Amino acid sequence: MFKKALPFFIHIITPLHAGTGQELGIVDLPIQRERHTGFPKIEASGLKGSMREVFEENNKKVKVGNKEVSINDKITIDLTFGPEAEISHAGALGFTDARILLFPVKSMKGVFAYITCPQVLKRFEEEIIIAGGKIELNGQKINISGIPKNSFPKDTSQVLVSSKVILEEYTFELNPNEDLKLFANWLAQKTGIEKIPQKIVVLSNDDFKDFVHLSTEVITRIKINNATGTVETGALFTEEFLPAETILYSFALASPIFKEKPEEKGIFNQPGKDEAELVLEFFKAGRPKVMQIGGDATIGKGIVRIKLWEDEK
């Protein structure tokens, strides 16, 4: 059972396709979505696999507790991420699905706005509390669940025209909110994205759902026959992407090592130290600041920035 949890943020730099395979809808290759809300997500399995690949390619030496190890040490990776033959034992490091927090939408003023909604904010707050975190700015608790729909951060927004925001071709009347201002400043500190207080707006749950369905990037792709210079038969398809600037969050989860004999626990065999804490320490030491997630890696898609909860910059 997991004993420790560490939140982290995923800031999409280039459009990201975490796909579900082919479907019969309008888009041939849609992105992953939650079944009950329709909100975009990245499955934990895909996130974990991408993270493991980065660890396996990094030969940097790090200190975990009082022992030193290479990040790509096979024994350590198998103990944390799990062995290739899963029947032997489970890994001590897990991940949750990456959930949407802020979604970028074209704005008449300020180029684009970050939109979210009360449902997303309330769920984010609940999950942070479950993980043992606090949402406070300078010692002041932020009432996220009290932030209403159709609001903007008081005094900081740069996407408003009078008291309205124009997103795509839709106009929304907004009201200033002090709690949203505090939350936006707090989130900017945690993610390192300084423009959040100037661009964030809270819409209704239904309006948010419409935008995350209708304002993703859908790209038409083709394959050219080198001999004829024309499109090959059946080689025209559409592919959906989460747009650049999208912000998601996930949790790294740690448990004690799933080995009975101390000598089989590798660097995590440190009497007097919490094994789950050592697993998180290894993750924090080896996690990448920039990595690739999802499909189309060879055409530059899916580049993201990873920001741990504890990081200051």
Predicted regions and their residues:
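Basic, Gly/Ser/Thr-rich N-terminal segments that form RNA-phosphate-binding interfaces in CRISPR RAMP
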Residues: 1-313
